[in-house]
Amino acid sequence: MANTRNIALNVLLKIENEGAYSNIALNNAIKENRLSGVDSSFVSALVYGVLERRITLDYIIRSYSKIPLRKIETKTKNILRLGILQLLFMDKVPDSAAVNESVNLAKKHKLQKSSGFINGILRNITRAEVKYTLPDENDRAQYLSVKYSVPENIVKLWINSYGENNAEQLLASLNGRAKICCRVNTLRTDADTLIKKLSDEGVVAEKIPFINNALYLENTGSVERLRAYKSGLFHIQDASSQLCVNFLDAKPRNIMLDVCSAPGGKSFSAAQYMSNRGRIFSCDMFDHKLKLISAGAKRLGITCISTLLRDASINDTALPVADRILCDVPCSGLGIMSRKPEIRYKDDLFSNDLPDLQYRILCASADNLAVGGKLVYSTCTLNPDENNKNTKRFLEEHPDFYGIPLKLPNGIARAFDEEPYEITLMPHTCGTDGFYISLFGKKASN
């Protein structure tokens, strides 16, 4: 029988010590250990539970430990986090198992001195009538930070940018697994047929009401094993990204640039809007990412995509003039923390270099847009410095461009006042990842 807690600990250490991505580290561990469905689910719950609640868990450790948190060795700290998670946030794990298995885990890693320390803290928690008390509610940033396990600098950013009500609902939406969404490959099938085929494989599929040919999926297991996936009948893509391509409105025979394309999902969706007729140039700085795009296009039967190795921040006169340009730029990723909870702990989330890079990509890309064409600038983050401020500056400095009002589908609404050409999608208002989309057109120069 697999030692699931040890596997979870090793994944957490890889994420914390080596900067590994949670989804990749977890998937690799599940495959390497050949875990059953039940064991996979338990390991996933442990890993994501600790990542989603780390600030809360560390706050609880501080309240019970005489040793400062910074002086507790990393392995010991993560074993404590796992133990407290099971005691306070996982109802199906008996207290005795949470305590005993945590102590055994410490001994397995030759942490003999730490095993007694871990045992003492966990047993004190089990005996306490009030397990822990949150900080004073009057200090809103600290209170919300500990309650929802998000760093105070992000909490303050969202309160100042979106208002306290939006900020708290946004924070509350982060924990728990995000919905799996897919785009139906309309070159090979339709939504109703795909729903039936997925049902035959035990997958529950439901149409997303605010965008055509998009489905919510449940009970997928490993998506790559599904016959419908292998047959190229769909690709995984959140509804926010699908809306982004929808607003771009690519047409058959268009020439399109996808300037930061990898892993290619938006290019694939655009190709379907174009009925696989026209040209899409999918660009990235790294050759191995371009190979992923080519492989995905081949699986889906898409032939109108060509890949280009290039730096999107540099003007390229060799590129064709394009009818449609998609600038889905590198970003801090604050909108996808429900999928990658470790993002919140990164040290460089608020680097000034990132908005500057994004702006250079936008300006360089705009040079290739045809008069009368459309350009989408988008990110998967929730930070006005990377979103609204960049696009406002772009319009101020590019008089030959104008904002095109977005036609929002039923079920999609702005959470706060924005310009008609832009929307910040929020999980609590739209049921999507956090995402920013803006749409621009180009007029003839005077």
Residue ranges: model-predicted function:
Residues M1-N446:
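S-adenosylmethionine
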